[in-house]
Amino acid sequence: MSPSFSGAAIRQAFLDFYAQRGHQVLPSASLVPEDPTVLLTIAGMLPFKPIFLGHQDPQYPRVTTAQKCVRTNDIENVGRTARHHTFFEMLGNFSFGDYFKKEAITWAWELVTEVFGLPPERLVVSVFREDEEAFALWRDAIGIPPHRIRRMGEEDNFWAAGPTGPCGPCSEIYYDFKPELGDEQIDLGDDSRFLEIYNLVFMELNRDSEGRLTPLARQNIDTGLGLERLAQVLQGVPNNYETDLIFPIVQKAAEIARVDYFQASPEQKVSLKVIGDHARAVMHLIADGVIPSNVDRGYVLRRLIRRMVRHGRLLGIGEPFTLPVVETAIQLAEAAYPEVREREAVIKAELQREEEQFLKTLERGERLLFDLFANVTASGAPKQISGADAFKLFDTYGFPLELTQEIAQERGFSVDVQGFEQEMEKQRQRARAAHQTLDVTAQGSLDELAEFLIETEFLGYSQSSARGVVEALLVEGKSVPQVEAGQSVQVVLDRTPFYAESGGQIGDRGYLAGDGVLVRVEDVQKRGDLFVHFGWVERGILRVGDPVQAQIDLACRRRAQAHHTATHLLQAALKKVVDPSISQAGSLVAFDRLRFDFTLSRPLTPEELQQVEDLVNTWIAEAHPAQVSIMPLAEAKARGAIAMFGEKYGAEVRVVDFPGVSMELCGGTHVSNTAEIGLFKIISESGVAAGIRRIEAVAGPAVLEYLNERDSVVRELSAQFKAKPQEIPERVAALQAELKAAQRALEEARSQLALLQAERLLPQAVAVGNLQILAAELGSTPPEALKTAAEHLLHKLGEGAVVLGSVPEAGKVSLVAAFSPAVQKLGLKAGSFIGEIAKLTGGGGGGRPNLAQAGGKQPEKLAQALQVAQERLQAELSSGLGS
């Protein structure tokens, strides 16, 4: 292997190339991004996202970087394919409103062909199907033959960093590992032949949460060249793991496992590659400040470490082994990323602690598993570990399913994987149903603290501010003596005015202020008798025992109060207008809206919804005062107070009463008079389950915000239609009628065009005895018109068979077969025949013996499929006629 093509040399050559073309070389950003919408830095462009969005001015018009990235969305493929990784380096050049497509394409080609010496004849490029400018540049400016420029759809060649944010069409350079197959078989989806090495994104659009695309303030360039991928090509190795960037780590793991990598079994190689990959990710994550935990990026790190340990066990390594492996990773990375050596002690300490802890988990899990083996054997039942037991091992003891399966197999047992997945889905449903804010470790820590901490005194019914003392601080689920600026923290006070989430009402927001310290509180949760304030330290140092002034955000509290009281009024109105037997099935009381689920087997009519809304607003206008009292549960029920079905209440309950309107058992906060709500507006009514309906609504200031948003939409529609607001429904109806008429006319025109085109296909028919065969492609003809054309052709041909195919839209194939009675008598059925042909295009279908339709999703294989159809028809009809 030439030293000039080492991983380090590739990285430096890339940066030097663009530095010579006016780019500022910037160091890699941290794997912990400033962007709150993503856990980790997943792409080279992520540090520049604010610039691409126009939220921040660039310091330099052109930059180039070698960016550390971590992605875990395909973690199960790591080690099993040649190119999947969790950690990788993305080399990139970026332009912020400076150069655009021409320069990006020209320089990319110059770099890969002249600097790295890749033969042009082994390169293929792709462009977005609608990007004519990029296609012309590759063809005319670079000189690539058109057949080696592939037009691709949005799924392949329209790039985005995520569901929202900067995006745009892209163009990719692929390396051809098998040029001897020729240009006739260029399929960029064939990973064994083609490897994408360079992606050029022409970043000119922004996609919002509604999926709308709008132009960015500047036309930008964002490129990405995978260092590991290019190293594989230049170093002539079969996969990324055998490049000099990773292979020394793999070899170290093999040495510890006493395995010869080149003589290892396929599964052993997978484990060695997983260890080599994860070691790099773990090293860089800890170096960038991530520590193992059960939440967010800390959980990603913990999972990677545990996968390393598990794959070590699969290799037969029974003792801790990760430190020498990561030391090799540090040696490889320290020249480019000095921080990994500077934080070596932290990296190894966190890794050692996590590995030792997980090994204990594995030992404990194995003991429990062996007990299960013994119990099942003694019972005489089939040798299978139930899904519930496998899930308990996983969920309670962190014992991986794969390890349970491996050990079970060694003992002649199977594992009910389907049952395990069912238990996993149940847990996901529980997680979705419950607002989880504490991780498992944090819950355990609080349980321990609760043994000696006093119950938090809640003052929030009468006070918005109160003096309290810090009883406990938790970071990442662990009790700590102090926290500093920039840290997320959970604070337990001896007394607080903050309402903790319960009864559907979300927790208060606000702040805790002390001597030189300020903690912003974003949520409050109740754990037993303790109120836990979730937030982050904006400035100063907060210590256990410090006195603080706890102040709620009054504006948020008032919004929550308005929505909570409105929820009570809504339930009362539903009982009065719709059905007295209606009962609450769930609720959400937030700052910006309310949601009320209730029992009813049918949708509400528009008239009922309006009556309910009007009645609530009437009660608001009547200014009913609130009366709150504490009384025995039996007395409250005797007075007619509404209790939520299934809720557990103590001997004494809090009753919120708006006399003559509503009386409920409730621990939430409310307005002192219904007039404080102002207005109430129902937004929607829908079904959420059998017998359960849901109303979403807004109250108080949120009504004005909702109406302003609606008004903005109406004004925009008025401008678009050049009509008064009251005229919009009529204009929309007219437009819909015009659209339907145009669609009918278009379909008719397409059918006529298809028939004209079909007529031209008649000379292509082939005679087999007295039968005529025709298999042909009919452009972009829609399915219905294609069927009409097939019937028309069969009528013209007389006795025979017609198979037609088309590509009605990108990524879709339409097929139809029409067989005459004479063909059917020979045993050929249109339905089964076209179904088999459709499989060749990645689809399926069928229908009647005389006429059938099918579809596919691989247009590039349509011509081949039609050729197969022609050959099969000729062969089978010849055979039938001959017999």
UniProtKB/Swiss-Prot annotation:
* Cofactors named for this entry: Zn(2+)
Q: Name one GO biological process term.
A: alanyl-tRNA aminoacylation
Q: Name one Pfam family in it.
A: DHHA1
Q: What domain of life?
A: Bacteria
- GO terms, molecular function: alanine-tRNA ligase activity; aminoacyl-tRNA deacylase activity; ATP binding; tRNA binding; zinc ion binding
> Which residues of the sequence carry a binding annotation for Zn(2+)?
H564, H568, C666, H670
Q: Which residues form a coiled coil?
A: none
Per the UniProt entry, the Enzyme Commission number(s) are 6.1.1.7
What is the cofactor note? Binds 1 zinc ion per subunit.
Which cellular compartments is it found in?
Answer: Cytoplasm
What functional role does this protein have?
Catalyzes the attachment of alanine to tRNA(Ala) in a two-step reaction: alanine is first activated by ATP to form Ala-AMP and then transferred to the acceptor end of tRNA(Ala). Also edits incorrectly charged Ser-tRNA(Ala) and Gly-tRNA(Ala) via its editing domain.
The record's domain comment reads: Consists of three domains; the N-terminal catalytic domain, the editing domain and the C-terminal C-Ala domain. The editing domain removes incorrectly charged amino acids, while the C-Ala domain, along with tRNA(Ala), serves as a bridge to cooperatively bring together the editing and aminoacylation centers thus stimulating deacylation of misacylated tRNAs.
Q: What is this protein called?
A: Alanine--tRNA ligase
Gene name of this polypeptide: alaS
